[in-house]
């Protein structure tokens, strides 16, 4: 049974600015060390940061909580499986809320075109 859906679209140039200005404090607040390493190692790092940010926003929309009650950007992490498929890992309060709601699965799709990055996420009970 579907519990919630979330969609978010992000302008990649916003993250290009953060990367160009070397705004590490913002990037470190939003992304986990593993995400920072992954994105920073890519030729188009801003695109990868934007996709991960959109996924986190989509998750918060699907869950219906936003960033409150102790949920942190660091509690949501986007990783890729061995075939490149994106997956969301949850820790901390985000993981607790996911479990408390009786949720079982996260379906995540990421895409980009031109200067836009989009994430679509479905939470299943």
Swiss-Prot record:
Any stretches that span the bilayer, and where are they?
none
The places in or outside the cell where this protein is found are:
Cytoplasm
According to its UniProt record, this protein's enzyme class is transferase
* Protein EC: 2.7.8.7
Q: Which InterPro entries match?
A: 4-PPantetheinyl_Trfase_dom (IPR008278), 4-PPantetheinyl_Trfase_dom_sf (IPR037143), ACPS (IPR002582), Ppantetheine-prot_Trfase_dom (IPR004568)
Query: Domain of life here?
Result: Bacteria
Reactions that this protein is recorded to catalyse: apo-[ACP] + CoA = holo-[ACP] + adenosine 3',5'-bisphosphate + H(+)
- Family label: Belongs to the P-Pant transferase superfamily. AcpS family.
Matches recorded under HAMAP family: AcpS
Function summary: Transfers the 4'-phosphopantetheine moiety from coenzyme A to a Ser of acyl-carrier-protein.
Q: What is this protein called?
A: Holo-[acyl-carrier-protein] synthase
Q: Which organism is it from?
A: Geotalea daltonii (strain DSM 22248 / JCM 15807 / FRC-32)
What's the encoding gene here? acpS
């Amino acid at each position: 049974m579907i519990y919630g859906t979330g969609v978010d679209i992000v302008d990649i140039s916003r993250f290009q600015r953060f990367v160009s200005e070397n705004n590490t404090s913002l990037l470190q607040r939003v992304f986990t060390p593993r995400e920072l390493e992954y994105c920073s190692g890519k030729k188009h790092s801003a695109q990868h940061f934007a996709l991960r940010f959109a996924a986190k926003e989509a998750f918060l929309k699907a869950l219906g909580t936003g960033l409150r009650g102790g949920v942190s950007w660091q509690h949501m992490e986007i990783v890729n499986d061995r075939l490149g498929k994106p997956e969301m890992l949850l820790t901390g309060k985000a993981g607790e809320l996911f479990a408390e709601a009786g949720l079982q699965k996260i379906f995540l799709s990421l895409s980009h075109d031109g200067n836009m990055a989009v994430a679509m996420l479905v939470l299943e009970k």
